[in-house]
Amino acid sequence: MTQYTPMIQQYLKVKADYQDAFLFFRLGDFYEMFFEDAVKAAHELEITLTSRDGGSSERIPMCGVPYHAAKNYIEQLVEKGYKVAVCEQVEDPKTAKGVVRREVVQLITPGTMMEGRTIDEKENNFLAALTHFEDGSYALACNDLTTGQNTVTLLTGSVEDILLEVYATGSKEIVVDSSFSKDELNKLTETLKMTISYEDATAIPEGLEHLVKNVSQAKLIKAVGRLFNYVIRTQKRSLDHLQPVEIYYTNQFMKIDVHSKRNLELTETLRTKEKTGSLLWLLDKTKTAMGGRMLKQWMERPLIQKERIEERLEMVETFVNDYFLREDLKEKLKEVYDLERLAGKVAFGNVNARDLLQLRRSLLQVPAILEAISLLDNAYAARLIQGADPCESLTELLGRSIQENPPLSIKDGDIIKDGYNDKLDQYRYVSKNGKTWIAELEKRERDITGIKSLKIGYNRIFGYYIEVTKANLGALPEGRYERKQTLANAERFITDELKEKETLILEAEEKIVQLEYDLFTALREEVKVFIPKLQHLAKVISELDVLQSFATVSEEEQFVKPVLTTKREIFIKDGRHPVVEKVLNGKLYVPNDCIMPENMDVFLITGPNMSGKSTYMRQLALVTVMSQIGCFVPATEAVLPVFDQIFTRIGAADDLISGQSTFMVEMLEAKNAIANASERSLILFDEIGRGTSTYDGMALAQAIIEHIHDQIGAKTLFSTHYHELTVLEDSLDQLKNVHVSAIEENGKVVFLHKIQDGAADKSYGIHVAQLAELPDSLIARAKEVLAQLEGQEEIVIPKRVEVKEQEVIPEPVVVKEEPVAIEETKVDNKEESQLSFFGTEQSSKKQDKPVLDVKETAVLTQIKKIDLLDMTPLEAMNELYRLQKKLKKG
């Protein structure tokens, strides 16, 4: 290192402590980067890569960005998952001896960003910390630095379960200890796409002990300690806005794994990954940013306590029934600023005068909001606003201190109102009246000298001066004026009186700006005292905002209040898929009932492709989620149990499990449901078994249905194209066949989208292909093949018969029994050549035909119908195996 210049040595010394971050090294008006940082940053930011002499034999790669534009460049890097260490000059270069002292003042990471394009106002920006213990358990702590919110929970289960809970937090960055295995880290980085950071310290930092007063479990404290130590190490500033840690337990909320959340499109759509088109998009009628964040949190964790759900529903009902109360509340909420994030800005010291003005305007709405809610005859409402302080003294303080239209910068003055500070008023009087005095002096000097063109001006070099044209110099009295500057056509002078006033005026203006800055920073410190009250107020207002949002959307979309029951029954009359109905935008939507009494656990759903089976299944799940977050539901009547979990297998393969086939993903998600579901769960399986051969798929589907029916007892919707499975209704007493109806008119299929009792008779797949405008020749060929297949052998479904208690053996049951016609026709040359593919010698027409029994003749007939050109090699092998197996049977 000694071969480098002192400045580069300083850079390398600082960089050594921030190896995993870009180091923005302040040099004058630029942040510079060197060596590998420069090469990588130039590529990522698309800026010029240059070089400089650093004292060694080779020039050092270098790139830089202007300090006033650095924020944008930092955001770009953090958006891509990088960290940025900001190294500032911490002493005046003019007074520095040797190299100017520099220090890292902040480490900006994906999980600690306070503002920027990546921070959605209606989403939290959580930083997660995961701690692994020897007994296999984990503790997960999360912090949103923008709001000060802190949570912690204890997790048990498989690594996959832990990762899914981490994923559910939406964290972009996770803090672990240095002993984490490479396998675990790979899952975090590759599967969850998170930035990894390290922190080994787990003791609660000094000064933050009060935040964990309600946390007694050592494991949870360690996780929180790791989180807090990392935040302190990276932020290097006040954290007065951090809120007490909230403990949550995953068994206190409905469990919806990340696959199911995505399949149901709760907060984002599967296709675009955007909010628009999701359930959150439909339900979000919130008027505040903090209300929007709370709504998303509620949707991530629906309640399972019946009493708490009913409390919310009653408040929503109150708002639905009182239009004027709801509309008045909405108007007031529109004026409420993001109190949570403002508290964070106050604590961090980056709040400006406009922010405080917005705070005052927000607080002006609070007394009326609290009063209106206090008048409600509702215990939940009374408990909600209990302890909420409208902070009227803060409102008054901000009202008499901040100007109505302050500038963005707090260093430009014109922030503080007149009358707030006596000294400031005096300076302003001098500044204002000093300029008036200058104007009066100019008039007086003109009168004394008789020079009408005499004027008093100002510039930064000479200050105030009296300017007289050369033609009028003879009119000046001797000894009164001191020459200051000579111009081509004029002379500039000063007087003792002018110099004295100049000093007063300029000092006053400088002192005004500095004093206003000092007064504002002092005011900011006073506001800090109110942070806990503001945060409590924010929670109250957020909750009211979510409840009015539910009421607003419920009235607009004609939702109904669900009745919660302790029985295991579902009664939904005229249920609708809320998002599909909204997207149809007034077009006719076909509602459907879902009636499953206590003795009915499984709906086996058959019906045409594109008829609405998946929509019907999602509809039930969304109605359930809406009910358990406290919202009305899309139906004319709804009686629902409280479900503990929702499991779904709907749609295409989930990219979270990268590299797996659709069938493997189906099996993994089926396993998850089978292993974890209870009789209080809801299971939605769409076309399980489609990713393998027909027989394998059908066998697996039947086995899964039977297991759910016999062993779990969960309410289940199971859609299938295996119509042969509908005979299970005869052997499974808590299973019912339902189908989505369709009719044929003039050779075309019309989907009625109506759920009816009984099994469907057709899938109408070819009709769907016609709708997709596949070639006519292909459609015609498909119809030929379908006719051939429908004439083939019957499919036998194993029926269970009771032999003794809890012992079941299969007994074949014929689903479709149509005798296969035994053809006596001659085999032509073409057919002979096809048979030779299976090892049979070509026969001459003159030779005698072999004598075949009935079974062999039936197989021969089926072979004749096979078109190998329309089959893949694998399909051909499967067909050969099936026919061979048929021949071997006795």
Curated annotation (Swiss-Prot):
PANTHER family assigned: DNA MISMATCH REPAIR PROTEIN MSH1, MITOCHONDRIAL (PTHR11361:SF34), DNA MISMATCH REPAIR PROTEIN MUTS FAMILY MEMBER (PTHR11361)
HAMAP family, A to Z: MutS
UniProt key word ATP-binding: yes
Record key words, sorted: ATP-binding, DNA damage, DNA repair, DNA-binding, Nucleotide-binding
The keyword Methyltransferase appears for this protein: no
Family note: Belongs to the DNA mismatch repair MutS family.
Descriptive protein name: DNA mismatch repair protein MutS
Entries under NCBIfam families matching the protein: mutS1, PRK05399.1
Source organism (scientific name): Bacillus thuringiensis subsp. konkukian (strain 97-27)
Stored InterPro entries: DNA_mismatch_repair_MutS, DNA_mismatch_repair_MutS-lik_N, DNA_mismatch_repair_MutS/MSH, DNA_mismatch_repair_MutS_C, DNA_mismatch_repair_MutS_clamp, DNA_mismatch_repair_MutS_core, DNA_mismatch_repair_MutS_N, DNA_mismatch_repair_MutS_sf
Cellular component terms (Gene Ontology): cytosol
Pfam families: MutS_I (PF01624), MutS_II (PF05188), MutS_III (PF05192), MutS_IV (PF05190), MutS_V (PF00488)
CDD domains given in the database record: ABC_MutS1
Gene name tied to this protein: mutS
GO molecular function terms noted in the UniProt entry: ATP binding; ATP-dependent DNA damage sensor activity; damaged DNA binding; mismatched DNA binding
Binding site for ATP: 607-614
Biological process (GO), any one: mismatch repair
Domain of life: Bacteria
General function of this protein: This protein is involved in the repair of mismatches in DNA. It is possible that it carries out the mismatch recognition step. This protein has a weak ATPase activity.
